[in-house]
Amino acid sequence: MHFTRTWLSCALALTSLLAQLVSIAQAQGSPEAQATVEDLGKSDPIAAAQKILEFPGIFDPDQSLWASDANITGTGDLQQVPWSRGAFFTWNPWTIGTYKTGYLWLPERFNMFKLNRSLVVSKSGDDIAIDPFYVNKHYDPEKIERAIILIPGQWRDSWKYLNLLGNAYRVAQKYPELNVGSGKVLMLSPTFMDEVDRKRGAMKKNEITFQKAGWSAGDTVRHPRAFKHMSSFDVLDFYVSMLLDRQQFPNMKTVTVAGHSMGGQTSMHYAMLRDLTDEDARLKYWVGNPGSYVWLNDTRPFSTAKCPEYGEWPYGMSVHKSIPRYGRKGSGKNGVHRIENFLKRRIHFSVSLDDNGHGPENCKANAQGVSRVCRAAEWVAQRGNSTEGWSKSHTIDFIPGVSHQDYPVIAYYGTLKFLFTDQE
């Protein structure tokens, strides 16, 4: 009798555990709920974000990755998207190394792109600073009407990101209403390499390198030492100015600074700190699935009791001394002037509805939410409860059935429309 009770207790416990596991696996927005959010986000981003915050498991930090259950595009970036209409897909180039160990070399030529190692972004006496970048193999500057500066993610693999953009470009050409003409789009990706890449042999003498991922928040150059004052955002300024220069590109209509993941964070950080200029009417930003957001006020959806630094840059604007020198001057109390400029810029956000990976796991990020999709929804939703509100210059796509995947997000129709056209 005792054995029977013990067996029964174990069976009930196992059944309960299995039920919990099934519940965890299924705790996410259903395809129907995600489709509703996708549609609502086009007209009312704040209401759509509030719907996301009703998804089962959205506040659970121990969720299994939703990508394993409901993705419509697999779980990576090594295949064409279902909506490609037969567009050709090119695999990514390769090198040896990782973002932690450093790279042995930079791929030279692939797909429709090549590596340019001759761009001098700054001079100081006899010293020069060169930033290698990837760009179209062939183009006529007089025919270029649009340029996309694609910032890499944490792995610093600009070659991969630009190859994915090239694949997305071919998908865009399959949609006649987008009118993406051949030879009119210049695609390029700067490199933001690490000191460890220099030690492994990937970087040459005068080529700039940074320390770890500091470049994503506006950190300064580590090498060459003559340029230790130069911010990664100064480098982006150089690219933007070059592309908007009528002497070099007489028919340029629009330049877009774009990025996904850490590249998305970089794009947002740059949009927040860059000065507003007369040329900004021709400048746009695309922010895809950043791991955290620059909050526009001091509120946070989760406790900050054990995180007094929660408002520091790049998680907020309220700690003046934490703002990089690049954008500190004239930022105003709590960054008010930078925030005013940010709200005027043309920015498009992309949020994957299966992207429940943690992203940064420090207390400043965790005060914003438990995952990337949770942080995105909280950041959008709080703008409905603040004086800033949702800017008319900002748009957003909530992407169903996609997780933290570079290519499906870049190749999503709404992203293609923003990157390759000026259609509203």
Task: Tell where the protein language model's regions lie, with residue ranges.
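Primarily recognizes the serine-hydrolase "nucleophile elbow" in alpha/beta-hydrolase
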Residues: 245, 253-305
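Conserved acidic catalytic loop of the alpha/beta-hydrolase fold
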Residues: 233-253
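The feature captures the conserved acid-bearing segment of alpha/beta-hydrolase catalytic domains
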Residues: 280-385
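Fungal secretory targeting signals
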Residues: 1-29
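C-terminal catalytic histidine-bearing segment of alpha/beta-hydrolase fold enzymes
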Residues: 361-364, 380-424
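A domain-start/cap signature at the N-terminus of enzymes
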Residues: 21-147, 159, 163, 167, ...
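Active-site glycine-rich loops that stabilize anionic/oxyanionic intermediates
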Residues: 152-156
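Active-site machinery of serine-nucleophile hydrolases
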Residues: 158-239, 283, 287-291, 380-389, ...
